[in-house]
Amino acid sequence: FEGEMCPLVVAAIEHLYYKGGKTVVPHKVNESGASSKEVGDIDVFDNAEQLVSSIEVKDKDFTKEDVEHAITKFAQAQIEKSLFIFGKHVNFEQHDVYETAAELGKKGYFCSVVSIMDFVRMRLYSMNGDVTINQLAHLLLEYARQINAKDETIERIKTCTTEFGL
């Protein structure tokens, strides 16, 4: 799905987590920064339309330089807290990546590097109220349309929702 599914899941989970209190804006995969308003793969805005958080999502192998580049973008946008989320099947040098994030954190730019599975577990655990598969499916489709996701990605979401009887 050319790296589209992970950002869609993250955007949908963030939307559910914030319950409308913040605006979650996913960007077309591999095009973050294409506009002066885009910082990460997913940007989060408060009700005053101020950027308050940004998330980089990697669903392919990455290096400490990728993490450093993301944190540098976040710093330039004056975002002090951010997330770098990686997919289930990616490879990276854990020590180097976490050390890089820690060093930049000491300079005031905090970026949590976390797996998609841990991110989803953490967010779902901290939400008050039930989240239904139906809500998640509708959000995935809504965000897929927003980023002009490939037809295969949209079909996969629809297939999964059919399998769950939605």
Task: Spell out what each predicted region is.
Residues 4, 8, 12-166:
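Catalytic core segments in nucleotide and nucleic-acid processing enzymes
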